[in-house]
Amino acid sequence: MIEAAVSMSALGLGLGLLLGVAARRFHVESPPIVDAIEGILPGTNCGACGYPGCRGLAEAMSEGAAPVTACAPGGRDVALALAAIVETDGGGGAVPGMAEAEPTVAFIFEDHCTGCMRCFKRCPTDAIIGANRQIHTVVTDACIGCNACIEACPTEAIVARVKPKTLKSWYWDKPRTAFEARGTEVAA
């Protein structure tokens, strides 16, 4: 019994050391811009952008093959942060190809749901709950708004709705200046 434990421990230690040496010897440095872009992306690896995960999108953005608006779950805030890194600012804080919109979540009309499980399988964050041939519903706190489930639904029972404001997601509006409050403009 002790011989087996000692031999397994020695084998584990030897293979661990071998993996450590291989990791150092065959390490490939990634460009720092790719790491910076990947750090800004949500990291859900949902594939809504059409790339294999957030790392693939970050590599494509660093090469200029993908627009900064490709990440739908990240929304406008992520697109603005990405525009600052890849230096494609649309001018004045605007991001080309992205309107300023409220975040959305999926909503299932339960009377149209057939329980086919296609939306359940496509959801990258497991925000849809339900069983086979049973009614499904969406957990709004877990939904990232990637709309993958909407495309997968054969009965069009899923729609995108504006994310409801809760105490977790509510923020004060940006204060207006005195000129904006009076409706006057500053003379140039």
Swiss-Prot record:
Residues 104-133, 134-163 form the 4Fe-4S ferredoxin-type domain. [4Fe-4S] cluster 1 binds at residues 46, 49, 54, 71. [4Fe-4S] cluster 3 binds at residues 123, 143, 146, 149. One of its GO terms (molecular function) is metal ion binding. [4Fe-4S] cluster 2 binds at residues 113, 116, 119, 153. InterPro entries: 4Fe-4S_dom, 4Fe4S_Fe-S-bd, 4Fe4S_Fe_S_CS, 4Fe4S_Ferredoxin_RnfB, Elect_transpt_cplx_RnfB/RsxB, RnfB/RsxB_Proteobac. It is found in: Cellular chromatophore membrane. The keyword Electron transport applies. Gene3D superfamilies: 3.30.70.20, Electron transport complex subunit B, putative Fe-S cluster. Residues 29-88 form the 4Fe-4S domain. The keyword Acetylation does not apply. Its cofactor is [4Fe-4S] cluster. Its EC number is 7.-.-.-. It is an enzyme of class 7 (translocase). The complex is composed of six subunits: RnfA, RnfB, RnfC, RnfD, RnfE and RnfG. Part of a membrane-bound complex that couples electron transfer with translocation of ions across the membrane. This is Ion-translocating oxidoreductase complex subunit B. It comes from Cereibacter sphaeroides (strain ATCC 17023 / DSM 158 / JCM 6121 / CCUG 31486 / LMG 2827 / NBRC 12203 / NCIMB 8253 / ATH 2.4.1.). The gene is rnfB.
